[in-house]
Amino acid sequence: MTNKRLSPQHKGAFVNTIFSGRLKHKVAWIKENISKTSEKKRRKEFEKFCAMGGEVRDANRFSSEELATIYVELFTLRWQGKIYCFKYEDLVRTFDALRHLIFGSVLFLNARPCAFDIIFMCSSPEWIYFDDINGGYDPQYTTLNLGSILLWLNTSNARALCAREKKTMRFSLGIYKEFWSYKKQWCDIIPLGRTIF
């Protein structure tokens, strides 16, 4: 099967392509800046999380086996079989091979992991691309908005890294579909391009 889709980042880079708002497939890119209201709200949620004993740990502190275990457990808790989870063995191999690209944090509460998103990062001379694959969280803490706290932390750290390196941030939450409308509060929804032939 040939994939004809192109990232918005490639607009103008190739001939034989089309980019139009009428194209069906769209991608969700985190907005360049967060509003003061949203920043204040996320900071309050984070402070509440910390006051309850919550911890933030760098994903790179964990072995590939530990990350795979954390991911499978939290993804399964979050989605309850509604979405296919990567196999443990495949995750370990992926984390081993792409260790140098891993980015982000793992949230802990009561000494147990409670939220984690797989994020891979790569850098070019002009921009840094972050690909947030998907993740999971422990639904017993739904009132704490762990998913929002984690995404806020990860995107804040990504913005800070890009500012230090004087590069443009491209942080993707993947393909956009209407049933993932929550992405609109975080993202600009941008049509993907495609090849003509």
What are these regions (language model features)?
Residues 1-4, 26, 167-171:
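Hydrophobic beta-strand segments of well-ordered beta-sheets in folded domains
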Residues 3-25, 31-142:
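A conserved beta-strand-loop-helix scaffold within acyl/acetyltransferase catalytic domains
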Residues 101-197:
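Aromatic (often tryptophan-rich) hydrophobic motifs at membrane interfaces
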